[in-house]
Structures are given as C-alpha cells and as structure tokens.
Amino acid sequence: MTRWTVIFKDTPDMLSIRADKTRRDAHIAYVRAHPELLIGGGLKPNPDQEFCGALWVIEANSRKEVETLILNDPFYVPEFRSYEIFTWGKILEDQITTL
C-alpha cells in the first residue's frame, strides 16, 4: 500500500458547511468508517483564526481510491473546497510515531 496526503484548501464559504451539525456528524461518521484514513484534521493559519482547509494521511492502493474517499466525504463540496493529492513516505520507516 502507498501512503498519500491530501491537502484541502477551503474558500471562506466552507465555514457554513463546517457549521452544519448534521453534515459535520455525517463527516465524522464517514471518517470513522474508513480506517484507511490514518489521520486527518482541519488547518488554520493560526490557532485563533478560522479553518482554511484540512490535511489527510491515507493508506491506499491507488490515487483513484483516494479520490473516491474524498468525493464521497459529506464535507467535500467542490464549490467551496479544492484538493491536491501527493504520495508520502516517512524518512524513518522503522520508527513508530503516535500523535
């Protein structure tokens, strides 16, 4: 399996999507149902500022699998969120890191 990172960039209008509790609950349930999404979370320029995007680290066999995961996420709204996908590897593969 390959490790992938996804960098999401949000427009300011994405804040309304984030504020929708029903959609947020669906997003959290979706993430929990996909253990291949190893880590994920929102990005802010500074702790006291609004979210401007997100970061995911995923293990998947193909870019297509990663894109499917993105496109089916309840938080993905193409008008308000763009993304870039990159392959990713650890410099110290033998070292285990817990966040």
Segments the model singles out, each with a brief description of its role:
Residues 1-99:
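Conserved, structured core segments of small domains
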